[in-house]
Regions:
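Class I SAM-dependent methyltransferase "Motif I" SAM/SAH-binding loop
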Residues: 83-87
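Conserved SAM/SAH-binding beta-strand->alpha-helix loop
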Residues: 108
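Conserved SAM-binding loop
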Residues: 115
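S-adenosyl-L-methionine
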Residues: 119-143
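Conserved beta-strand signature within the Rossmann-like core of class I S-adenosyl-L-methionine
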Residues: 184-191
Length: 310
């Protein structure tokens, strides 16, 4: 591994413990000076010599609200990526903004293992990774006005009628995000699902000064999520937007509005299940039998940002 160049964002204290087996370096990275790719696009960051690897996994979140300076061993702004999947967008932000702390979460342990491995090998000590859903995280572990940004890319639309309640972007969730953000804090949303986006455009501006974005994010293409890469390759339109928390909305008013707004009961477009299959590495033809409305198992996807696909 000595041929790998040291990254400028080195951890303050190199990890002394022997890494677990799942952190094995790929043959591709060995041949390409520490650079890995996915669908031909480099994964953000460069794999360092083992002595510079970080420890970023959270086996369990502490009870109650997270003490951010204690968790990251420094005091800095916090960005949360809910449903981070295998970590591409979080890694890109962590590489580009070493002065910012990043927490990536997902309900699937397997994708968090991928994200953790990549962050560890790149020495990104400004990241932490945890297996937890978005609602639970914000409700139980994030203190009011303690986070600078909350990102959610490609939330899972859930196709069955009895799964509507699992959809992440809802008035309740948006109220929790609004409460968690510091004054001037930012929400970032992205999806390839037109009906989901139309719903977001109706409810998100109630809590945020929200604007649509037509162009890719500045971190593209390296910072593109796995879902975004696949959807774009299939010609799907990607819907993006961001906004600041409304300063004229207090907690009680936000709670009242959340209770009065419509739930995300839109009719999900099942044609996008073919993209879901590609995201899982399957052939779309294998999903033809799902025309009866059955969806894949809840959360069974490459990487839910909470209840999401990344």
């Amino acid at each position: 591994l000595n041929q790998f160049e040291s990254h400028s964002e080195q951890p303050s204290e190199p990890s002394a413990a022997k890494p677990p087996a799942f952190q094995k370096i790929s043959d591709e990275a060995l041949k390409n000076n520490g650079i890995e790719t996915e669908f031909g696009i480099p994964i953000p960051g460069r794999i360092l010599v083992e002595e510079l690897w970080a420890k970023t996994a959270l086996k369990k979140l502490p009870d109650g609200f997270i003490n951010w300076p204690e968790l990251f061993e420094r005091d800095a702004s916090v960005v949360i990526d809910i449903g981070c999947g295998n970590g591409r967008s979080t890694l890109a932000s962590a590489v580009d903004r070493p002065e910012v702390n990043h927490l990536g979460t997902d309900i699937l342990p397997v994708v968090i293992r991928y994200a953790t491995r990549r962050a560890n090998q790149r020495g990104l000590s400004n990241t932490r990774w945890a297996v937890i859903g978005g609602r639970e995280l914000l409700l139980k572990h994030v203190a009011p006005h303690s986070v600078a940004e909350i990102h959610c890319y490609h939330p899972q639309p859930y196709y069955r009628q009895d799964q509507v309640g699992l959809r992440l972007i809802s008035p309740e969730f948006l109220q929790l995000v609004h409460s968690a953000l510091i004054p001037g804090g930012r929400i970032v949303l992205q999806t390839d699902h037109p009906s989901y986006w139309n719903y977001m455009l109706k409810v998100v501006p109630v809590f945020f000064e929200f604007e649509e974005r037509s162009a890719p994010w500045p971190s593209a293409p390296k910072g593109m999520t796995r879902r975004e890469i696949i959807a774009a390759s299939q010609g799907l339109r990607i819907f993006r937007g961001e906004g600041m928390a409304r300063m004229d909305l207090n907690f009680e008013e936000a709670l009242r509005l959340a209770e009065s707004l419509p739930l995300p009961t839109f009719n999900a477009d099942r044609r996008l299940q073919a993209i879901d299959a590609l995201e899982r590495g399957e052939e779309p033809s294998r999903r033809k039998g799902n025309a009866n409305g059955r969806s894949r198992r809840p959360g069974h996807r490459r990487g839910g940002r909470g209840k999401s696909r990344k």
